[in-house]
Amino acid sequence: MKRHEAREKALQVLFQLDNTDLTVEEAMGHIKGQPTNVFYEKIVTGTAEHLEEIDATLEQHLEKWSLARLPKIERTVLRLAVYELLYMPETPKRVVLNEAIELCKTFGDDSSSKFVNGVLSKFTEQE
């Protein structure tokens, strides 16, 4: 499984976990496809484990928005990207931003990628 595909599957798992009572393992079990890999498991479990810190960080970088008001797909993409930016410094920032934008183009609408790009660009400039 390539990293892009791992991020797509991770996004699907995290999307399921948002406002549900599913465990990470249950949500991961609902995603079909190729066998999992270490990167996929790390970004799913890491994002879930650090969700409070990630959300607090995101709240600081959202202008005129609250995390609760964001559409679920944008919120999930932002959480996944911020996890990588904060806890996986070996991944270049530009790669994380590009992958987040591509995920929005695949799973969101036209405005999703622009919004996520703006939030993450602001985040990376300030960090």
UniProtKB/Swiss-Prot annotation:
Keywords: RNA-binding, Transcription, Transcription antitermination, Transcription regulation
Name of the encoding gene: nusB
Gene source species: Lysinibacillus sphaericus (strain C3-41)
Job description of the protein: Involved in transcription antitermination. Required for transcription of ribosomal RNA (rRNA) genes. Binds specifically to the boxA antiterminator sequence of the ribosomal RNA (rrn) operons.
Biological processes annotated in GO: DNA-templated transcription termination; transcription antitermination
Pfam families: NusB (PF01029)
InterPro entries: NusB-like_sf, NusB_fam, NusB_RsmB_TIM44
Keyword Phosphoprotein: no
UniProt keyword Transcription present: yes
A GO molecular function held by the record: RNA binding
Family from the record: Belongs to the NusB family.
Membrane-spanning intervals of the chain: none
CDD domains assigned: Terminator_NusB
GO CC aspect terms: cytosol
Protein name in the entry: Transcription antitermination protein NusB
